[in-house]
From Swiss-Prot:
Homodimer. The modification N6-(pyridoxal phosphate)lysine is found at residue 265. It is an enzyme of class 5 (isomerase). It comes from Chromobacterium violaceum (strain ATCC 12472 / DSM 30191 / JCM 1249 / CCUG 213 / NBRC 12614 / NCIMB 9131 / NCTC 9757 / MK). This is Glutamate-1-semialdehyde 2,1-aminomutase. The gene is hemL. Its cofactor is pyridoxal 5'-phosphate.
Length: 425
């Protein structure tokens, strides 16, 4: 028995499903999850000692590569001074200043420990600020696992209160409306009918939880115009895209100024750190200034802040995003080329350090189109690449990530492996 399988079987005895986050269980692709023993740069080594070129990168945070010496040293230095205090630190002020400097839309920011905390509190804050209850999200966009946001969409103009998880009462989600991503007409009709009742609209400005779907310019412009017109709060959930697609995040690429922004992943440099921030008048409603409550024992943890500050310093080096973007684009375009040579139908896309590939004849623009891709072919390709020592996300609905540690040679070796894998399909 392999060490990976042994650990998986042991884990299932004491951890539900053997993992601490569902996608890690290889449920969609089948087989045995790889238990990571260590990671460095663009690689990780599993419990059996096999090396993999990693395009998951901890689901996005590892933008400078695993175990970057400057990030590791920052965490080590912070640990010597204590692990947690339950009191404010200078580092919290410094990283807040850095976030506000990088994102003009963020006038004030609050640190939390997870993306779920960030989006959950941003929703609560928007409701407290507007005095309204209704929230709008989009089908296929994931915003963490708080009850109000675990809602799936159905047919028709709106879907009221359809929880997509057990244990979520319908009463918790009856104020959540689900619309179609990139559907400007539906969005406009919704605001025309009930715009004065909507507290906020939350979206992934580049959807990374239905593979990779970019919004149309018309869609993001309509979002900003309609929310402003009706007094609703526009929330850009940049937990995944924040500092991953550009130094100014997705909002900078779109030329949109949201009212609130949520951050995570990259901002913590691989440690548990997230944030929400935005307009000062909205942020002024949060406790202790206002009546909207939020708190956390480990919020602003000094080790997480140290890792985040070190990472934010590294990504601001000249040419960082130009190099990252060009290598990611080469990977995406190269995958399409290798598939074409093998006679395999494949579409690809990339933005900044994120990429997606889909076994369909065109890149999807909505959840319905994303779920129409050939999942069986994806499974075979995933395992073929795993055999080649290349680790892609074990789900057809997750974006991939390139780091600064991925060299041109690594990208080319990945494409050569993909050519062999496509030939096996």
């Amino acid at each position: 028995m392999s060490r990976n399988l042994e650990l998986f079987e042991r884990g299932k005895q004491v951890i539900p499903g053997g993992v601490n986050s569902p996608v890690r269980a290889f449920g969609q692709v089948g087989g045995t999850p790889r238990f990571v023993a260590r990671a460095e740069g663009a690689y990780f080594w599993d419990a059996d000692g096999k090396q993999y070129l990693d395009y998951v990168g901890s689901w996005g945070p590892a933008i400078v590569g695993h175990a970057h010496p400057e990030v590791v040293k920052a965490v080590q230095d912070a640990a010597v001074g204590g692990l947690s205090f339950g009191a404010p630190t200078e580092g919290e002020v410094v990283i807040a200043e850095e976030i506000c400097k990088l994102l003009p839309s963020v006038e004030q920011v609050r640190l939390v420990s997870s993306g779920t905390e960030a989006t959950m509190t941003a929703i609560r804050l928007a409701r407290g600020f507007t005095g309204r209850d209704l929230i709008v999200k989009f089908e296929g966009c994931y915003h963490g696992h708080s009850d109000s946001l675990l809602v799936k969409a159905g047919s028709g103009l709106l879907t009221f209160g359809n929880p997509s998880s057990g244990g979520v009462p319908a009463d918790f989600t009856k104020h959540t409306l689900v619309l179609q991503y990139n559907d400007v007409e539906q969005l406009s009709r919704t605001f025309a009918e009930i715009g004065d009742k909507i507290a906020c609209v939350i979206l992934e400005p580049i959807a990374g939880n239905m593979n990779l779907i970019q919004p149309s310019r018309e869609f993001v412009q309509a979002l900003r115009q309609l929310t402003e017109k009706h007094g609703a709060v526009l929330i850009y959930d940049e937990v995944m895209t924040g500092f991953r697609v550009a130094k100014g995040c997705a909002q900078g690429l779109h030329g949109v100024t949201p009212d609130l922004t949520t951050l995570g992943k990259v901002v913590g440099g691989g440690m548990p750190l997230a944030a929400f921030g935005g307009r000062a008048d909205i942020m002024g409603k949060i406790a202790p200034l206002g009546t909207v409550y939020q708190a956390g024992t480990l919020s602003g943890n000094p080790l997480s802040v140290a890792a985040g500050l070190a990472t934010l310093k590294l990504i601001q080096q000249p040419g960082f995003y130009e190099t990252l973007g060009s290598r990611t684009a080469r990977l995406a375009q190269g995958l399409a080329e290798e598939a074409r040579k093998a006679g395999v139908t494949l579409s690809t896309d990339s933005v900044g350090g994120m990429f997606g590939f889909y076994f369909s004849d065109k890149a999807p623009k909505s959840y319905a189109e994303a779920t129409g891709c050939d999942i069986e072919r994806f499974k075979r390709f995933f395992h073929a690449m795993l055999d080649e020592g290349v680790y892609f996300a074990p789900s057809a609905y997750e974006a991939g990530f390139v780091s600064a540690a991925h060299s041109e040679q690594m990208i080319e070796s990945t494409l050569a492996a993909a050519g062999r894998a496509f030939a096996r399909l």
